[in-house]
Amino acid sequence: MAEELVKPYNGDPFVGHLSTPISDSGLVKTFIGNLPAYRQGLSPILPGLEVGMAHGYFLIGPWVKLGPLRDSDVANLGGLISGIALILVATACLAAYGLVSFQKGGSSSDPLKTSEGWSQFTAGFFVGAMGSAFVAFFLLENFLLSMAS
């Protein structure tokens, strides 16, 4: 039974990828294909903006609820400042990855695999993450939320 479900990818056991009913399903392939980094025909700044917006928005909540200022009146501001610091670190890491991974002036059919494309992705990430972090802060500050533990 296990032989029928899990088999080597493309029949080659040395590839290092197992083909399972989950990883080979059309639903999973469609979902992965629609992630921002894999969408075709977009400028690299747009996937970066989308990824940044998602990350900036969800980084603030854990800092507000679980951070060291969680029981104070400035928990939201503390969460914003901590989130901004983490976004800056993530942006620096993305920039460093681009510098060491892609040759200047290299050509590729995928814009995200060039130095210029990765730089645009990083810029989009930074703008999206900062914007959505401030949106999350605004929502937390201006809407009464239950603080019951």
UniProtKB/Swiss-Prot annotation:
Primary localization class, coarse: membrane
Q: What do the Gene Ontology cellular component annotations say? A: photosystem I reaction center; plasma membrane-derived thylakoid membrane
Membrane-spanning ranges:
80-100, 125-145
From what superkingdom does this record's organism come? Bacteria
Subcellular location(s): the record lists: Cellular thylakoid membrane
Which keywords accompany this UniProt record? Membrane, Photosynthesis, Photosystem I, Thylakoid, Transmembrane, Transmembrane helix
GO BP terms: photosynthesis
InterPro entries, per the entry = PSI_PsaL, PSI_PsaL_sf, PSI_suXI
Record's Pfam families? PsaL (PF02605)
Give the membrane topology, semicolon-separated if more than one: Multi-pass membrane protein
What the record says about family reads: Belongs to the PsaL family.
Put simply, this protein is called: Photosystem I reaction center subunit XI
In which organism is this protein found? Synechococcus elongatus
The gene name reads: psaL
